[in-house]
């Protein structure tokens, strides 16, 4: 009997032990499952929606400017300025200014430093050990990375220039499996503001901020033809290179006080002949220019030699946009600079690129509604662009007596486009209307009024009998429509 009790006791003990082990294993599995299903994000914001960051001990002036811009961007998104704070979730490092101790700490993070450390203007953004790590190879690279954070938060690089308001957000985060490694393929990327009203002292800083957000690093002058006297203090603080006569000057060294001059052999100058403004280029035409060797120039070309280099290498040249008004060319500039960084930026096609840009500006739902407007706008301007509608190009080939009055049909298409544009404008929230006007409505209505002004004037000239214009009601009616379009065009430009 005693043996039975002993055996029963041992059996009960084993059962209890097995039950405890089973419970322990189950608990472990539950914890593991909970860990796996938990949202793997690194949050930029605290419980109040405030963004904070830390930096290494020494940073360059352009990085400080970028941080100030970032602070304002975060206020626009979350309602609070981004602040520097010990132990913050965002850690920012400028590689060429790190102390030995700081560099050792960065190495331990396991970030792919070898991919950016020897490249100019490159940067890395990714998550490491529960923090969002931002590393720039130099001053510009670090500043560009900070501006990339603003872009990831929903602030367009063109926001300040096109009155685009970012969507409000209570929290910001980055998934742990996401990272960005960006290295420019074109070393010198920039613009030449020739004979421009924008080259005034009060605009220097504004232009430099646009270049910072677009990740452009060069202001261009060629052979004294351009009268832009760039402000040295602004250029230096934003770490901008200045190029003249195919030689570019930039500051180098850890203290950033040594000047280095470099000769550039191949330069792609877009709209350098002033025949067409940068703002008039469609995405397709701009892409063709950037991909064609026919737009390459070199220093040798100035001495009568071929402007195309047999040893051309895209990664070894400069891309410069010749513009007179950057405010009207921001979309084209952004596209050009994206391609200067990433040759696959338009791999999915121009249509997809435009759609993604509109989505970023206005949201996916509104962007999808706007896309057909832009498609029709580019189709109509590809038939006859506004830049080639007026003198000195003479009358257009549009004919009112052939092909079912193609002149009136062309203008009718613009009337339909204007009506659709206004219909969408009425549905927009108030905070998107200014941005919509600048990005969508203004270029569409500008092209429509120019076409109406020029083509109706052409119609009046063609149908009026010599010496009898005052008695020709049809000709006078066409002339009146042309004058009305001219007045509307003046009002549109004044409002813009």
Question: What are these model-predicted stretches?
Answer:
Residues 69-81, 148-152, 210, 214, ...:
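Structured segments of extracytoplasmic/periplasmic soluble domains
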Residues 23-183:
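Contiguous, structured surface segment used for ligand recognition
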Residues 1-10:
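Bacterial N-terminal signal peptides that target proteins for export
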Residues 66, 70, 142-145, 204-207, ...:
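Stable alpha-helical elements in mature extracytoplasmic
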Residues 3, 177, 265, 279-280, ...:
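Substrate-binding groove of N-acetylhexosamine-processing glycoside hydrolases
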Residues 51, 56-59, 63, 78-87, ...:
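Aromatic-lined carbohydrate-binding surfaces of glycoside hydrolases
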Residues 9-18:
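Bacterial N-terminal signal peptides
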């Amino acid at each position: 009997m005693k043996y039975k009790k002993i055996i029963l006791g041992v059996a009960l003990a084993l059962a209890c032990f097995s039950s405890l082990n089973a419970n322990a294993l189950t608990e472990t599995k539950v914890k593991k499952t909970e860990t796996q299903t938990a949202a793997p994000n690194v949050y930029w914001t605290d419980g109040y929606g405030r963004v904070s960051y830390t930096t290494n001990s020494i940073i360059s002036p352009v990085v400080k400017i970028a941080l100030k811009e970032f602070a304002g961007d975060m206020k626009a998104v979350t309602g609070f300025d981004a602040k520097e704070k010990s132990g913050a979730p965002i850690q920012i490092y400028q590689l060429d200014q790190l102390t030995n101790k700081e560099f050792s700490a960065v190495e331990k993070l396991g970030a792919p430093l070898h991919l950016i450390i020897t490249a100019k203007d490159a940067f890395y953004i990714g998550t490491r050990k529960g923090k969002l790590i931002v590393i720039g190879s130099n001053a510009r690279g670090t500043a560009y990375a900070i501006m990339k954070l603003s872009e990831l938060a929903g602030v367009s690089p063109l926001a300040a220039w096109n009155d685009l308001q970012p969507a409000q957000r209570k929290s910001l985060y980055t998934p742990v499996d996401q990272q960005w490694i960006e290295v420019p393929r074109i070393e010198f990327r920039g613009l030449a503001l020739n004979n421009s009203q924008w080259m005034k002292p009060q605009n220097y800083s504004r232009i430099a901020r646009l270049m910072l957000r677009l990740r452009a690093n060069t202001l261009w002058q060629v052979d004294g033809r351009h009268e832009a006297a760039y402000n040295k203090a602004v250029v230096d603080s934003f770490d901008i290179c200045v190029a003249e006569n195919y030689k570019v000057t930039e500051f180098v060294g850890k203290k950033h006080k040594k000047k280095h001059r470099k000769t550039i052999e191949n330069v792609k100058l877009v709209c350098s002949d002033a025949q067409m403004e940068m703002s008039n280029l469609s995405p397709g035409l701009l892409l063709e220019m950037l991909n064609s060797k026919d737009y390459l120039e070199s220093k040798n070309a100035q001495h009568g030699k071929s402007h195309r280099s047999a040893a051309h290498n895209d990664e070894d040249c400069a891309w410069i946009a010749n513009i007179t008004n950057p405010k009207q060319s921001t979309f084209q500039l952004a596209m050009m600079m994206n391609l200067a960084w990433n040759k696959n930026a338009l791999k999915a096609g121009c249509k997809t690129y435009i759609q993604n840009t509109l989505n970023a500006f206005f949201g996916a739902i509104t962007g999808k509604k706007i896309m057909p407007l832009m498609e029709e706008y580019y189709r109509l301007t590809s038939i006859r662009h506004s830049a080639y509608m007026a003198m000195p190009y003479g009358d257009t080939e549009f004919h009112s007596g052939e092909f079912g009055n193609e002149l009136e049909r062309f203008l009718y298409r613009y009337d339909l486009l204007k009506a659709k544009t206004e219909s969408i404008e009425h549905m927009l929230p108030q905070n998107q209307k200014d941005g919509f006007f600048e990005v969508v409505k203004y270029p569409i209505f500008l092209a429509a009024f120019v076409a109406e002004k020029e083509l109706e004037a052409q119609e009046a000239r063609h149908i009026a009998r010599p010496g009898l214009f005052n008695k020709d009601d049809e000709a006078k009616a066409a002339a009146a429509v042309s004058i009305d379009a001219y007045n509307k065009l003046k009002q549109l430009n004044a409002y813009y």
